[in-house]
Swiss-Prot record:
<dbReference type="InterPro" id="IPR022890">
    <property type="entry name" value="Fd--NADP_Rdtase_type_2"/>
</dbReference>
<keyword id="KW-0285">Flavoprotein</keyword>
<dbReference type="InterPro" id="IPR023753">
    <property type="entry name" value="FAD/NAD-binding_dom"/>
</dbReference>
<feature type="binding site">
    <location>
        <position position="35"/>
    </location>
    <ligand>
        <name>FAD</name>
    </ligand>
</feature>
<keyword id="KW-0274">FAD</keyword>
<dbReference type="Pfam" id="PF07992">
    <property type="entry name" value="Pyr_redox_2"/>
</dbReference>
<keyword id="KW-0521">NADP</keyword>
<feature type="binding site">
    <location>
        <position position="48"/>
    </location>
    <ligand>
        <name>FAD</name>
    </ligand>
</feature>
<feature type="binding site">
    <location>
        <position position="286"/>
    </location>
    <ligand>
        <name>FAD</name>
    </ligand>
</feature>
<dbReference type="GO" id="GO:0004324">
    <property type="term" value="F:ferredoxin-NADP+ reductase activity"/>
</dbReference>
<feature type="binding site">
    <location>
        <position position="43"/>
    </location>
    <ligand>
        <name>FAD</name>
    </ligand>
</feature>
<comment type="subunit">
    <text>Homodimer.</text>
</comment>
<dbReference type="InterPro" id="IPR050097">
    <property type="entry name" value="Ferredoxin-NADP_redctase_2"/>
</dbReference>
<feature type="binding site">
    <location>
        <position position="88"/>
    </location>
    <ligand>
        <name>FAD</name>
    </ligand>
</feature>
<dbReference type="InterPro" id="IPR036188">
    <property type="entry name" value="FAD/NAD-bd_sf"/>
</dbReference>
<dbReference type="GO" id="GO:0050661">
    <property type="term" value="F:NADP binding"/>
</dbReference>
<feature type="binding site">
    <location>
        <position position="326"/>
    </location>
    <ligand>
        <name>FAD</name>
    </ligand>
</feature>
Length: 332
């Protein structure tokens, strides 16, 4: 029996990889998707299931959980093979132009590869205060999985970017009170959400920096705050702390692969067809760079069909490729 060779292997099961999977299915490409986590969704599904996502056209204020559920529903219309809980350890390009994909579980082959790894492995930037580690997972968290955990609680959110603002606005309707502690007077969020924040009941503690925390009992925590460029101090007694200082990420595993991919600032460089410096290897999502690139889910949704269509034309140059899903006769 001849060895199976896929047309396409998608590495990464975040939103961009999921949408690429759907488009491979639409074009009836023999494809597989490999994801290291035991479920699809990537960072959006793992870290922000309750957070509102606003940059997806036609889906205002969809939660991360609901967005991933919709993408899974879409993938089921034109399914491809999925291998979850499997980390790709190496990708090797052979002399015949095909690729060998190695994981700890198996070895497979493919005629083309789409890398959709986002920013790679991600870990939250931790609150560097004595005692913070001891209450992590109790009074202190780095992301919000369930809004109900914050119902009728006094909550302090530490941070000043888009995600911190989104969390504050998300918890405002359910929490007893919400404080947003930021070391600057200005916030780094989108103008519209900053306006919403200023019109909300969220209490803005700026420009303050947390200097110490004290666990008063098994339930509450006191935060000692120091005003920037001043000797003024303040205290907050809260039930819950959410730290949102961003995440550190890396694609260290990618650097171990037997591929020579041109990169810039640890991002994979691609051309207008989303192809990398290695022919047959495409890359999409937050882990790529090109002139004008914006790191948004919406951008990844545009890059996925670009990559799939480009590689499909190369693999099957004589096949007429329908460009619009409305012309493909799809039925649910």
């Amino acid at each position: 029996m001849a060895e199976k060779i896929y047309d396409v292997t998608i590495i990464g099961g975040g939103p961009a990889g999921m949408f690429a999977s759907f488009y491979c299915g639409l074009h009836e490409l023999d494809a597989q998707l490999i994801e290291s986590l035991p479920q699809l969704g990537g960072q959006v599904g793992a870290l922000y299931p309750e957070k509102q996502v606003w940059d997806v056209a036609g889906m205002p204020g969809v939660t991360g959980h609901d967005l991933i559920a919709k993408l899974e529903e879409q993938m089921a219309v034109a399914p491809i093979d999925q291998f979850l809980g499997e980390t790709v350890e190496d990708v090797i390009k052979g002399d015949d132009g095909t690729f060998t994909i190695k994981s700890a579980k198996r070895v497979s082959r493919s005629r083309a590869v789409i890398i959709a790894l986002g920013n790679g492995a991600f870990t939250p930037r931790k609150l560097a205060l004595e005692g913070a580690a001891e209450i992590e997972g109790k009074q202190l968290s780095y992301f919000v999985n369930h809004k109900a955990d914050y119902a009728d609680k006094r909550v302090a959110i530490l941070g000043g970017g888009d995600s911190a603002i989104d969390i504050a606005l998300m918890l405002e309707p359910v929490a007893k009170e919400v404080h947003l502690v930021h070391r600057r007077d200005q916030f780094r969020g989108l103008e519209h959400t900053v306006t919403q924040l200023k019109q909300s009941s969220v209490q803005l503690d700026t420009p303050f920096l947390p200097r110490a925390l004290t666990v008063e009992d098994d339930e509450t925590v006191t935060l000692d705050l120091k005003k920037m460029r001043s000797d003024d101090e303040a205290q907050l007694n809260v039930d819950k702390i959410v730290v949102n200082y961003g995440f550190t990420s890396n694609n260290a595993a990618l650097n171990q692969w037997s591929l020579d991919l041109a990169a810039e600032h640890n991002l994979i460089k691609v051309d207008s067809m989303m192809e990398t410096s290695t022919e047959g290897v495409y890359a999409i999502g937050d882990g790529v760079t090109y002139p004008g690139k914006v790191a948004l889910i919406a951008a990844g949704f545009g890059e996925a069909p670009t990559a799939v269509t480009a590689l499909a034309k190369k693999l099957y140059p004589d096949k007429r490729m329908a460009m619009h899903s409305s012309s493909m006769g799809i039925t649910k």
